[in-house]
């Protein structure tokens, strides 16, 4: 088994003291060398983190010791490397940003559909299947016959619904996302608008890929994930996509053959959208990344900070020894 556990977790629950949870949560993560980002808001917790089995178990035990989070939803996958550089806990207005006041998945939400029942639902000709993710995510993988709303952010989803969906016309609507959290809000939003039969994939794409054998699957392509793996395949292993360090878009092997691709600087998605100053900064950053790699170090994050401190200490010791040598030679 791979050395590191990657855990995507969330829970919609009233956390009136969410600000006070930040410091102890960050302390637990740092103590157990768990990296990644967790978001805290009055409406709950959300994020993806990674660490050793022992570290993740310690974090989950701490979270679940709070009765409000005892049944939080989480999904695990594994990799040889931790796909994050830093450890962060952020305070937010929403744990997933839709930007619509009054939407509360704790009060009303769509019907959860288990992964093993999903295929039967979405092959029903009366069901409208919608991917609630961003366009760049949909481009690298989706369920067969799913509609792409072509949104750049989740904030745009309500406008898509208002312009394209009608409760009187669309009697059955099924939606899905990466891990389930966006669908908690999107189905709650549709229910508030008067849509009656609204369904969503419990646990999201990641749970479907885990539970449904590939030979029975209706999933096409890979699944984008918000960490350094970029995407995962049907076995939840790191996929074939890389990421442009300039625009953060997923890039394929074909993209990297483009004349517009320059590692760490530009890709076919962004080459005509960046300034000369940005290109120079991206090129300088890529040089620093390659320099760090040549030393066997990370270029950012806590490990990079440790490496810098170590080099500084070594230089200081070297200077001290040099001055001692000069002093002894003069005596």
Curated annotation (Swiss-Prot):
It catalyses: uridine(34) in tRNA + AH2 + O2 = 5-hydroxyuridine(34) in tRNA + A + H2O. The active site is at residue 177. Its EC number is 1.14.-.-. The keyword rRNA-binding does not apply. Residues 293-331 are annotated as: Disordered. Residues 307-323 have a biased composition (Basic residues). Residues 123-217 form the Rhodanese domain. GO terms for molecular function: oxidoreductase activity, acting on paired donors, with incorporation or reduction of molecular oxygen. It is an enzyme of class 1 (oxidoreductase). Gene3D superfamilies: 3.30.70.100, Rhodanese-like domain. It holds the Pfam family Rhodanese. Keywords: Oxidoreductase, tRNA processing. InterPro entries: Rhodanese-like_dom, Rhodanese-like_dom_sf, TrhO, TRHO_N. One of its GO terms (biological process) is tRNA modification. NCBIfam families: PRK00142.1-3, PRK00142.1-4. Belongs to the TrhO family. HAMAP family: TrhO. Catalyzes oxygen-dependent 5-hydroxyuridine (ho5U) modification at position 34 in tRNAs. This is tRNA uridine(34) hydroxylase. The gene is trhO.
């Amino acid at each position: 088994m791979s050395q590191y556990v990657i855990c995507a977790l969330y829970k919609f629950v009233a956390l009136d003291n969410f600000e006070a949870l930040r410091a102890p949560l960050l302390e637990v993560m740092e103590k157990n060398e768990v990296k990644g980002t967790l978001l805290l808001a009055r409406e709950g917790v959300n994020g993806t983190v990674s660490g050793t089995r022992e570290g993740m178990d310690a974090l989950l035990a701490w979270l679940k010791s709070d009765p409000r989070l005892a049944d939080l939803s989480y999904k695990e996958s594994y990799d040889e490397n931790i796909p994050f550089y830093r450890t962060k806990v952020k305070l937010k207005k929403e744990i997933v940003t839709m930007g619509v006041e009054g939407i509360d998945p704790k009060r009303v939400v769509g019907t959860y559909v288990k992964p093993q029942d999903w295929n039967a639902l979405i092959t029903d000709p009366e069901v409208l299947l919608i991917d609630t993710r961003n366009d760049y995510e949909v481009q690298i993988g989706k369920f067969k016959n799913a509609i792409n709303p072509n949104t750049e952010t989740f904030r745009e989803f309500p406008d898509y619904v208002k312009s394209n969906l009608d409760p009187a016309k669309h009697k059955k609507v099924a939606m899905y996302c990466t891990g389930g959290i966006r669908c908690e809000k999107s189905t709650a939003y549709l229910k508030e608008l008067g849509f009656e039969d609204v369904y969503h994939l419990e646990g999201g794409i990641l749970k479907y890929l885990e539970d449904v054998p590939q030979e029975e699957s209706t999933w096409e392509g890979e699944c984008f994930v918000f960490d350094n793996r970029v995407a995962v395949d049907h076995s939840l292993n790191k996929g074939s996509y890389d990421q442009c360090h300039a625009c953060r878009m997923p890039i394929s092997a074909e993209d990297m053959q483009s004349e517009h691709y320059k590692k760490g600087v530009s890709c076919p998605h962004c080459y005509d959208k960046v300034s000369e100053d940005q290109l120079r900064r991206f090129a300088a950053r890529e040089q620093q990344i390659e320099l760090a790699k040549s030393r066997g170090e990370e270029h950012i994050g806590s490990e990079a900070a440790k490496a810098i401190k170590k080099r500084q200490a070594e230089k200081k010791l070297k200077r001290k020894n040099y001055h001692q040598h000069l002093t002894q030679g003069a005596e």
